Amino acid sequence: MRQFKVSHPGEMIARDLEDMGVSGRRFAHNIGVTPATVSRLLAGKTALTPSLSIRIAAALGSTPEFWLRLQSNYDLRQLENQIDTSGIVLYGESNEQQQNAQEH
């Protein structure tokens, strides 16, 4: 199984806010969500939603698509680290290779 380490978008936002000297509470107030929501996001404990991505993009000068791509990439890597695909036969291989894989 392949292992990938990709940062949660919230962790990236946390670093950006720290660099700018902006607290999570202040950021939450600015984007119109609860401090608890931002706290969970910055800790990587909750996914970035489309609604949050719009608000975050407006506050940080980026696009919602950018943040959603980061979240999607993070989610995909997490699943790739959890799902064992070693027993799945690749279609399109020669019949002999498929039969050998099925026998093992």
UniProtKB/Swiss-Prot annotation:
GO molecular function annotations of the record: DNA-binding transcription factor activity; protein heterodimerization activity; toxin sequestering activity; transcription cis-regulatory region binding
Domain HTH cro/C1-type: 13-67
Classification via CDD domains: HTH_XRE (cd00093)
DNA-binding region(s), residue ranges: 24-43
Transcription found in the keyword field: yes
Top-level taxon of origin: Bacteria
Function per UniProt: Antitoxin component of a type II toxin-antitoxin (TA) system that counteracts the effect of the HigB toxin. Binds to its own promoter and regulates transcription of the higB/higA operon.
Oligomer and partners: Forms a complex with the mRNA interferase HigB which inhibits the mRNA interferase activity. The heterodimer dimerizes to form a HigB-(HigA)2-HigB tetramer that is able to bind to the DNA.
Protein name (Swiss-Prot/TrEMBL): Antitoxin HigA
SUPFAM superfamilies given in the database record: lambda repressor-like DNA-binding domains (SSF47413)
Keyword Transcription (UniProt): yes
Keywords: DNA-binding, Plasmid, Toxin-antitoxin system, Transcription, Transcription regulation
Residues marked Interaction with HigB (site): Q3, F4
InterPro entries for the chain: Cro/C1-type_HTH, Lambda_DNA-bd_dom_sf, Toxin_antidote_HigA
GO BP terms: regulation of DNA-templated transcription
